[in-house]
Amino acid sequence: MLDISVIILTYKEEKHIERCIKSIKKYSDNIYIIDSYSTDNTIAISKSFNSTILQNKFINQSKQFAWALDNINFKTEWILRIDADEYLEDNLIIEIKNKLPNINKDIVGINLKRKHMFMDKWIKFGGRY
């Protein structure tokens, strides 16, 4: 397991949250769901994976993420923010496992390149690649 915590912002994400959490569980057990009072099964599904659930009124993504940073006592060196409808492919997880421990200690943040998928196809144009 990596020394990383994961923040997932949710609101009515029962359709996506299981796939997202399953991809994260391959490298971290420190999963924090910041939910905006979902009325579907988002919370129940997240709890079934032993995720930590916190709820906060949603204003915008930036404020919700900042709220998480201010209200969680992280015990890991790194924090990853991911949307509930996103997931990590195995090759990206391997790359994270191989590269993260070797990043210079002066670096405090990184940006991961992502594949944007639509209807099971990788979007490689329109500023998304």
Q: For each of these PLM feature ranges, what is it?
A:
Residues 66-78:
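Active-site nucleotide-sugar/metal-binding loop of Leloir-type enzymes
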Residues 18, 40-49, 91-92:
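Acidic helix N-cap motif at the loop->helix transition within catalytic regions
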Residues 1-23:
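N-proximal low-complexity "stem/linker" segments adjacent to membrane-targeting elements
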Residues 36, 56, 76, 82-86, ...:
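Short acidic donor-binding/metal-coordinating loop in glycosyltransferase active sites
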Residues 23, 35-44, 83:
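A conserved acidic beta->alpha catalytic loop
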Residues 22-31:
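Short, acidic, metal-binding catalytic loop of nucleotide-sugar glycosyltransferases
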Residues 56-64:
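A short, glycine-/small-residue-rich helix N-cap motif at loop->alpha-helix starts
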Residues 61, 77, 87, 91-124:
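Conserved donor NDP-sugar-binding/catalytic core segment of glycosyltransferases
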